[in-house]
Structure formats: C-alpha cells, structure tokens
UniProtKB/Swiss-Prot annotation:
Origin superkingdom: Bacteria
Family matches, as SUPFAM superfamilies: Ribosomal protein S16
Source organism: Pseudomonas fluorescens (strain ATCC BAA-477 / NRRL B-23932 / Pf-5)
An example molecular function term from Gene Ontology annotations: structural constituent of ribosome
GO cellular component: cytoplasm; small ribosomal subunit
Keyword hit for Hydrolase: no
GO biological process: translation
InterPro entries noted in UniProt: Ribosomal_bS16, Ribosomal_bS16_dom_sf
Ranges annotated as spanning the membrane: none
One Pfam assignment: Ribosomal_S16
Alphabetically ordered keywords of this record: Ribonucleoprotein, Ribosomal protein
Protein family according to the UniProt entry: Belongs to the bacterial ribosomal protein bS16 family.
Record-given protein name: Small ribosomal subunit protein bS16
Length: 83
C-alpha cells in the first residue's frame, strides 16, 4: 500500500523532514516514489516551516495513497494556510 509519510533528514539536533510517497513496507528513510514537500519543525525567522506540492498530493491521494497521522495534520495545516 502506498503511504505519504515523513522521511528524516537534517543533522544532529536539527531535524528536517521530507514528505515522501513510498510503499508502506519500505524503511522510513528508504527508497520512495516521489518527494512532495518538506517540513522544518524548528524553522526560525524567515525560514519556511512547511512546503507541500498540493497538486501532487491530490494526485497520490486519488490513486489510493494513505497519509500518516502526522502528515494528515500537516496537510490540513497547509490547506488552511493556502486558503
């Protein structure tokens, strides 16, 4: 089953996540089909905290991808900010 979830990046004590579409059986940071955005939980000042490609997310959801709990919250936040 396809899932949209966070893949950890960044460095020590500076987490950074990529929103990726992947098979649910793959490891968290393993191979993925597509990267559809990013999330920076410790963004400061003018840094972008959340960026989501809404068109691609809509496509993947239409073909059956399921978002993780945290990604669902982030997508809701992103849609609210875009409106």
């Amino acid at each position: 089953m396809l899932t949209i979830r966070l893949a950890l990046g960044g460095s020590k004590k500076r987490p950074f996540y990529h929103l990726t579409v992947t098979d649910s059986r793959n490891p968290r940071d393993g191979s993925h089909k597509e990267q559809v955005g990013f999330f920076n939980p410790i963004a400061r000042g003018q840094e972008v905290r959340l960026s989501v490609n809404q068109e691609r997310v809509a496509y993947w959801l239409s073909v059956g991808a399921q978002p993780s709990e945290r990604v669902a919250q982030l997508l809701k936040e992103s849609a609210k900010a875009a409106a």
